[in-house]
C-alpha cells in the first residue's frame, strides 16, 4: 500500500479541451440535490452558524449544520419555512435520538443527516443509522468518521448513504498525538484506500490546506470535501475576533477541544487563531475558479474528469509516476 498525503502528490495535466476555464463545470450531484461545488464547510461552531448555513443553502452550496448548543428542530423548521435544504448533524446519545424523533413526529424531517462522531466504526453508529432509516426514511444519511476500508464497508452495509473518511487529519485535531491513531499525515492515501471498496459517495474530511487539495481529493475518490481551516477566519465566521500586533484573527477550535466541550475530558482538539480572510463569498468564488482551472488541466469539462488523470508521488520509496490507479 502506498502512503502519501496532499503535499506529496501532484496531478499530471492532459491536453486542454476548452477555450476558457469558465466552460468547466465544478458542480456535483450529492444525494437528492446538485450543488455548485464539491465542498462543504466543516460542521464546527467556529466555522458556521445558522446565518451562514442559510446563506449557503440559498446559494446552492452544501452545508452540514453543527449539533452544538442548537435547537435542531427550530433550525430545521426555519429552513423549511424559507424553502431551503435541511442538513443537520447528529450524535449517538439519547438526546440525539430525541431530535430524530421530534423531526419525524413534527413532520419537518430533514434532507441530510450527518452522524458525526470521532470514531464512526461503532455499534452506536449502526443503531443510529437504523433509527434514522426507520423514523426518517427519506433522509440522506451520512455517517463517520472512518479511516479504513473495513469500516467503510460496514457503514455502507448498515445503511449509510455516504461515509465520511478522515480521523484526525484536521488542523485543530490532535487525535494522532493523544491516541496514536488516525489518518493524519496519510489522509489522501486513506481516501484512496477506502474509495477502492466504496459503492456509495465519500466525503473526504480534513487535511485540506490549499484549494488544489480539493481537486486531489476528487481524483482519489471523494464526492464531497469537508473543509475547516480554509473556511474559518472569515468576516462572517462565528468565532471571536482578536487583535494581535495590529492584525485581526478569528478563533478556530476543534469539536473535541475543551473550548467546544466546556470541560477538559477526552480532549482531541485544540484552539488556534486564523487570520481574518475577508468574505466567505469571495473564498467560494475563488475555490470555484481554481477548481475550474483544475478541470481544464485535467483535459476535461466536468468534475468527474479529474479522476482520469495520472499523478506523481514526490520523494520517498513510492516516488514515481502512477497511471490511473
From Swiss-Prot:
SUPFAM superfamilies in UniProt: Inosine monophosphate dehydrogenase (IMPDH)
Q: What is its EC number?
A: 1.7.1.7
Q: What does the record give as the function of this protein?
A: Catalyzes the irreversible NADPH-dependent deamination of GMP to IMP. It functions in the conversion of nucleobase, nucleoside and nucleotide derivatives of G to A nucleotides, and in maintaining the intracellular balance of A and G nucleotides.
Output this protein's name.
GMP reductase
Question: Which Gene3D superfamilies does the record associate with it?
Answer: Aldolase class I (3.20.20.70)
Keywords tagged on the record: NADP, Oxidoreductase
Active-site residues, Swiss-Prot/TrEMBL: 173 (thioimidate intermediate)
The gene for this chain is guaC
**One Pfam family recorded for the sequence:** IMPDH
Task: Report the family membership.
Answer: Belongs to the IMPDH/GMPR family. GuaC type 2 subfamily.
Q: Does the keyword Repressor apply?
A: no
Give the matching InterPro entries.
Aldolase_TIM, GMP_reductase, GuaC_type_2, IMP_DH/GMP_Rdtase_CS, IMP_DH_GMPRt
Q: Which residues bind NADP(+)?
A: 202-225
Amino acid at each position: 500500500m502506498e502512503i502519501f498525503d496532499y503535499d506529496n502528490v501532484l496531478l499530471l495535466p492532459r491536453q486542454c479541451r476548452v477555450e476558457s476555464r469558465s466552460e468547466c463545470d465544478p458542480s456535483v450531484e450529492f444525494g437528492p440535490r446538485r450543488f455548485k461545488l464539491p465542498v462543504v464547510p466543516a460542521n464546527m461552531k467556529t466555522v458556521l452558524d445558522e446565518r451562514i448555513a442559510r446563506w449557503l443553502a440559498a446559494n446552492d452550496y452544501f452545508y452540514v449544520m453543527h449539533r452544538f448548543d442548537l435547537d435542531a428542530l427550530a433550525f430545521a423548521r426555519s429552513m423549511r419555512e424559507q424553502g431551503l435544504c435541511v442538513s443537520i448533524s447528529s450524535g449517538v446519545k439519547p438526546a440525539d435520538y430525541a431530535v430524530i424523533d421530534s423531526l419525524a413526529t413534527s413532520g419537518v424531517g430533514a434532507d441530510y443527516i450527518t452522524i458525526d462522531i470521532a470514531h464512526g466504526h461503532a455499534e452506536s453508529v449502526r443503531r443510529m443509522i437504523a433509527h434514522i432509516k426507520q423514523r426518517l426514511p427519506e433522509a440522506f444519511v451520512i455517517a463517520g468518521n472512518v479511516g479504513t476500508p473495513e469500516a467503510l464497508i460496514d457503514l455502507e452495509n448498515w445503511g449509510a448513504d455516504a461515509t465520511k473518511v478522515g480521523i484526525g487529519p484536521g488542523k485543530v485535531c490532535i487525535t494522532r498525538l493523544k491516541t496514536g491513531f488516525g489518518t493524519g499525515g496519510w489522509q489522501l492515501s486513506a481516501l484512496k484506500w477506502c474509495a477502492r471498496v466504496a459503492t456509495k459517495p465519500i466525503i473526504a474530511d480534513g487535511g485540506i490546506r490549499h484549494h488544489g487539495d480539493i481537486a486531489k481529493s476528487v481524483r482519489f475518490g471523494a464526492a464531497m470535501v469537508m473543509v475547516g481551516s480554509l473556511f474559518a477566519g472569515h468576516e462572517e465566521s462565528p468565532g471571536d475576533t482578536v487583535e494581535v500586533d495590529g492584525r485581526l484573527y478569528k478563533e478556530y477550535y476543534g469539536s473535541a477541544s475543551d473550548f467546544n466541550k466546556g470541560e477538559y475530558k477526552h480532549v482531541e482538539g485544540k484552539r488556534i487563531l486564523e487570520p481574518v480572510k475577508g468574505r466567505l463569498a469571495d473564498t467560494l468564488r475563488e475555490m470555484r475558479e481554481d477548481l475550474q482551472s483544475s478541470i481544464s488541466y485535467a483535459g476535461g469539462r466536468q468534475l468527474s474528469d479529474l479522476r482520469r488523470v495520472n499523478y506523481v508521488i514526490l520523494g520517498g520509496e513510492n516516488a514515481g509516476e502512477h497511471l490511473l490507479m
